[in-house]
Amino acid sequence: MLLSDRDIRAAHAEGHISLDPWTDEMVQPASIDVRLDRFFRLFNNHAYTYVDPAENQGELTEQFEVGPDEPWILHPGEFALGSTWEYVKIDETLAARLEGKSSLGRLGILTHSTAGFIDPGFEGHITLELSNVSTLPVKLWPGMKIGQMCFFQLSSPSEHPYGSETTGSHYQGQRGPTPSRSYQNFYRAQITD
């Protein structure tokens, strides 16, 4: 079940959802808007000749910070990691989904590539996978609305929520845009036929 605005407010009041800072005017009919933080990560194209998700490539991205009143310029065809200003926490009874804002989509800005799903039990700043598919550079301002989160009630509480010992939760409690940690649980089936 997708939560409505009144359900989101009630879930927040009951402690099922926490966004810090919480701003009531960010609540939409069936979502809550989230804002862009000041931290970004860009690929360091000179450190490696390729990306391998099975390896720890610690120097693959480099973090940058802009001032609170300075924009980050995302150039055409560029990919950068960003993060939400809000620290998000959801309990084991809910899951969430991050979607882009349609007004930004109409400018060619994609908020995430594939990682829009947020597991029950997650807490931290949400890493954004920002892309500019337009033909012009776009200014991204700290504090601007960058996406919206919608919440889903689970049929029963998660037995092993994100952050529990059994889930291998590599991004729990993350601050700022967190680079890939795919090497920590890399899985590859042996294809024989």
Swiss-Prot record:
Entry protein name: dCTP deaminase, dUMP-forming
Disulfide bonds: none
Biological processes per GO annotation: dUMP biosynthetic process; dUTP biosynthetic process; nucleobase-containing small molecule interconversion
Source species of the chain: Bifidobacterium animalis subsp. lactis (strain AD011)
Segments of this protein annotated with the region Disordered: 161-184
Name of the top EC class for this enzyme: hydrolase
Subunit structure: Homotrimer.
Catalytic center residues: E129 (proton donor/acceptor)
Gene this chain is encoded by: dcd
Domain of life: Bacteria
Residues with site note (Important for bifunctional activity): G116, F117
Keyword Cell wall biogenesis/degradation (UniProt): no
GO molecular function, one term: dCTP deaminase (dUMP-forming) activity
Similarity comment: family membership: Belongs to the dCTP deaminase family.
Database matches in Pfam families: DCD
